[in-house]
């Protein structure tokens, strides 16, 4: 089955992501995304979790707190969600929405290398705090 190609279903592609995390017996799973909205004024960071372990919410809070405190964009908070990859994987997992591609200000931010590096560093700091 071509799980990453044009013939793969959404479920096959999502399950392939879960399989990678499970294959390597990961301690946690972080799925990174860029959000979009028909409302061009909506923006901000959000982190989603599914409460299948005692640590999903804590991981989400640690990452979201780092992101929210360091950028001039809206903090959309930590939210519970039923997303496939964070629900189906066995370890603590989060899905991070890093701003909105549909918001011109945030699109400009996301194109900057400094933003990409800082976002990666802040997510890593949230993960470090989770393990502390």
Where are these regions (language model features)?
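Active-site-adjacent mobile loop/cap segments within catalytic or ligand-binding domains
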Residues: 19, 24, 28-39, 74-132
């Amino acid at each position: 089955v071509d799980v990453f190609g044009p013939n793969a279903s959404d479920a096959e592609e999502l399950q392939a992501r879960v399989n990678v995390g499970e294959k390597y017996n990961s301690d946690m799973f972080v799925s990174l995304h860029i959000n979009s909205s028909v409302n061009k004024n909506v923006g901000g960071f959000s982190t989603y979790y599914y409460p299948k372990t005692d640590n999903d919410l804590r991981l989400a809070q640690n990452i979201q707190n780092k992101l929210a405190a360091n950028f001039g964009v809206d903090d959309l908070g930590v939210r519970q969600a039923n997303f496939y990859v964070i629900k189906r994987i066995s370890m603590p997992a989060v899905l991070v929405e890093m701003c909105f591609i549909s918001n011109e200000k945030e699109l400009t931010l996301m194109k900057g290398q400094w933003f990409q590096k800082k976002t990666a560093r802040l997510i890593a700091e949230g993960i470090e705090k989770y393990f502390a």
